[in-house]
From Swiss-Prot:
Coiled-coil intervals: none
Keywords recorded for this protein, A-Z: Chromatin regulator, DNA damage, Nucleus, Transcription, Transcription regulation
Biological source species: Schizosaccharomyces pombe (strain 972 / ATCC 24843)
InterPro entries on file: NET_dom, NET_sf, Sas5/TAF14, YEAST_sf, YEATS, YEATS_dom
Disulfide feature: none
PANTHER family assigned to the protein according to its UniProt record, in alphabetical order: YEATS DOMAIN
Protein name in UniProt: Transcription initiation factor TFIID subunit 14
Quaternary structure and partners: Component of the fcp1/TFIIF/polII complex via interaction of tfg3 with both tfg1/TFIIF-alpha and tfg2/TFIIF-beta subunits. Component of the SWI/SNF global transcription activator complex composed of at least arp9, arp42, snf5, snf22, snf30, sbf59, sol1, ssr1, ssr2, ssr3, ssr4 and tfg3. Also interacts with the TATA-binding protein (TBP). Component of the mst2 complex composed of at least eaf6, mst2, nto1, pdp3, ptf1, ptf2 and tfg3.
Entry similarity comment: Belongs to the TAF14 family.
Compartment(s) of residence: Nucleus, Nucleoplasm
Annotated Basic and acidic residues bias: 149-159
Length: 241
């Protein structure tokens, strides 16, 4: 498992809305304000840049807002609203490639027109897509594009293992096409493949779940005929075989 440190900056801007109608509470008048919050990353030089390793950010506003749970999917993950009251909100950062999340609380106040809060993240990065996305904002220990390509080749080779003597035994599907089809599947489909393999697992099958590496290894030639047919049908419905 690779732990990557990143610093993100939550930036708040607010001002009194010109011509806005003031709210009155307990004989006190509160002007309506417009405010915005956005999330950026600090690079190694301390400069603000897009948090490219973030998939989306969810803001849980005060329940008096219409649709108080807001999810923003594009950098700088900015939300804009109007209101008169200060309040505490929960913010959730979701990492790329389904690589986890980070939750924290942020208090929206109107003492300053512009202010920011820096948040230190310790990201346990196991997903290849997250590791690659993190390289845009700084160093990632032990990661390189060349290493990722090597891992892809390794997965491909393992899915095709046994092409020699194991091919002597007739199989109910074209094993080469099945191996190619599995390589073309999207991540959500691959998760279903893992589930099908686990549900039909037998003692003769070679299956290895590398949790730390975020990889799932299978020897297709050790799978029973019924599972091969199931996987082939699954792939054929989703990719060109």
């Amino acid at each position: 498992m690779t732990t990557v440190k990143r610093t993100v900056r939550l930036i708040t801007d607010q001002n009194v809305l010109p011509g806005g109608e003031a709210a009155v509470l307990n004989d006190q008048s509160f002007p309506v304000r417009e405010w915005s919050i956005k999330l950026v990353c600090l690079n190694p030089q301390g400069e603000e840049t897009d948090a490219s390793f973030v998939d989306r950010v969810t803001y849980k506003l005060h329940p008096t807002f219409q649709n108080p749970t807001r999810t923003i999917r594009k950098p700088p993950f900015q939300i804009k609203e109007q209101g008169w009251g200060e309040f505490e909100m929960e913010i959730i950062i979701y990492y790329a490639d389904k690589g986890g999340e980070h939750r924290f609380l942020h208090y929206l106040h109107f003492q300053q027109e512009h202010y920011h809060e820096d948040i230190e993240l310790n990201i346990n990065a196991t997903r290849p897509g997250l590791l690659k996305a993190l390289t845009a904002t700084g160093e990632v220990p032990g990661y390189s594009d060349e290493g990722e390509e090597a891992r892809k080749d390794k997965r491909k080779n393992e899915s095709e293992v046994g092409a020699g003597k194991k091919k002597a035994k007739a199989k109910p599907v074209d094993m080469d096409k099945l191996a190619e089809g599995l390589q073309k599947l999207q991540e959500d489909d691959l998760l279903q493949v893992v589930q099908m393999v686990n549900e039909n697992k037998t003692p003769d099958m070679y299956v290895r779940n590398d949790i730390e590496g975020g990889e799932f290894h299978i020897d297709l030639y050790t799978l029973p005929d019924n599972l091969l047919l199931l996987l082939y049908s699954f792939c054929a419905k989703r990719v060109t075989m």
